[in-house]
Amino acid sequence: PGIYGYWDHMDFIIDAAARRGIYIGMVCIWGGLVKSGKMNVEEAKAYGTFLANRYKDRPNIIWMIGGDIYGNIKTEVWNMLANTIKSIDKSHLMTFHPFGRTLSAEWFNDAPWLDFNMFQSGHRRYGQSKDDKKTLLPQGTEEDNWRYAEHSLAQRPLRPVIDGEPSYEAIPQGLHDPKEGFWKDNDVRRYAYWSVFAGSFGHTYGHSSIMQFLKPGVNPAYGATKLWYEALKDPGFNQMQYLKKLILAFPFFERVADQSCIAGDNGTKYERLIATRGNDYMLVYNYTGRPMQIDLSKIHGKTKKAWWYSPRNAELSYIGEFSSKVETFQPEGGHLNGNDWVLILTDGTRKYVEALQ
């Protein structure tokens, strides 16, 4: 009594976030602590009971079991923690935060406590997983976060999925060595659009400086040089809103990933095109500005109207109206990495795009 402690400060953070409309991804305990034996099954039950009773009435909690760990390590501890929380708190969503380049569905897709799947596509560029044999996808596909979304959505029971940890803006490629170069705004845009257009229900954005709340007097990690409040001005951070604006301009719950919308070559690595659609609209993300053949018959409408939408600044430009089945589109700016655009197609009678103007 009279002492402002750890859990008092946790309460303050959660309530401060709630006042600002922010949800907290509540990582109960970091995976490394469980792996090293810092919490057993009985302790997980007691801890889960404490957490659930303390926060079950907070409106802005999303429970995250695990903490950057493979789900086959101390599985009994994770199941006990999750089931205990769920037995008390039946209102909040729950998922599992897996290790890099893995997916929660590998271990918990049948678990009654799992509400949605999460994958960590991680921070490595193509070719950096040389000796990693525990990842879900083969070497050479490290940046293809869309593959995790597709893999998850092929599982049964079908659960929503999200990339919980893609490459962060301004963090080293490969995470640890600044000499490898840093991920930039065009990279974090690509991860966001690839994942969402491949079927993820949302996206996680990260920034190296914001992650560490880097401020004067604190030693930086991962080669960070920018203070966290200065990083709020970085382009990738401010461009995430344009993806949300785009997706919510169209009927959300009928949207599916559909790569058959691409009549030509879907492409590999940075040339990969990713399409998503509803009944009468289609969105295609093109990271390199290359020509692409699109099957307009995949959506309803006698004629289709087309626009280019810029993920960099949300600018919208009208292309024209089409009645043919397959049409070739190429945005301005040339064929190069980071010249990314979204092709919007709608039934010619629909007014969805007005929300973007």
Regions found by a protein language model. Give the residues of each.
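Short, flexible, glycine/charge-rich loop motifs used to bind or transfer phosphoryl groups or to couple energy/partner
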Residues: 51-54, 84, 104-108, 150-152, ...
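Short, electropositive alpha-helical surface patch
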Residues: 41-51, 180-183, 222-227
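Catalytic-core region of carbohydrate-active enzymes that cleave or remodel glycosidic bonds
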Residues: 111-126, 130-214
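Active-site mouth of glycoside hydrolases
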Residues: 1-128, 133-135, 139, 143-144
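Short strand-edge motifs at loop-to-beta-strand transitions and within beta-strands
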Residues: 327-329
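Short amphipathic alpha-helical segments and helix-helix/interface helices
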Residues: 14, 52, 82, 148-153, ...
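Aromatic- and carboxylate-lined catalytic core of secreted/periplasmic carbohydrate-active enzymes
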Residues: 157-161, 168-172, 184-320, 332-357
